[in-house]
Amino acid sequence: MPRVQVTTARHVWPGMEIGLLGEHQAANAALAVVTVEQLRALGLTIDDRAVAAGLAGVRWPARLEVLSRQPLVLLDCAHNLASAQAMIDTLHASFPGERSGRRLLIFGGNRDKDLEGMLHLLAGHFTHLFLTGFDNPRCVPAEGLLKLAPKSVPCTLCPNAEAAWLEARSAAGPHDLICVTGSVFLAGELRPMLVRDLANDLGNGQPQVLQSAAAAVR
C-alpha cells in the first residue's frame, strides 16, 4: 500500500498506509488526520490505531480502482480536466510498467463537461480510444466524441458501454492497460459488468482480479 507521513504542530504520524492511490488521496488523508486532531482537542477520544486502520481500510469504488492486473484494468470516474490529470499522474507514478504495452482508453462523458479538453489531455497517454455513450440523457454519443477527439490517436466508435468494454477486452493482451474514465455514469454502468467478467476470467485462469487499488502497488 502507499504510505504517507503527516507532521502537525501536535504530532508526527509516520508511515501510515493508505488504501487509495494518488498524491491527491495522500493530501486527503493528511486532512483527515488534522481533522482527528481537532476533534481530540474538543475532547473526543480517538486512538492512533483507529486512525491508521481507517486510512488503510478505506475503499472507494471507481476512484483509480484496479480490477485486474493482467491485463491492468483501471476504473476511474474522472469527469473534468483536474481529475483526469490526477488520474494520469497517479497512473504513471503507481504503474510505471504500463507504458511497455498498449494503453487502451474507454471514454464517455457528459455534455456539460469539457470533453474536448479531456480527450486531448488523455490522448497523449493512450494508444487507442474506444469512444462510447452510456444510458443517461446527459451523455454525448460516440459520434459526437469523435468530433472532439484529436486525430493523432486511432479511435473505435462503440454503440454502448458494454460494446466498448467487449471491444477493448478483446483487443488487450496480458501486458496491456485498459482504462475506463470520463463520467461517473459510465463508471457506474460498467463496474458491475467488469467485476463479473473479470471474476469469471479469474476462474478460468485469466485476468487477476484485485480487491483494492492499493494492493496492486508493488
Set out the residue ranges of the language-model regions.
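ATP-dependent carboxylate-amine ligase
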Residues: 38, 80-218
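Nucleotide phosphate-binding/pyrophosphate-handling subdomain across enzymes
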Residues: 4-128
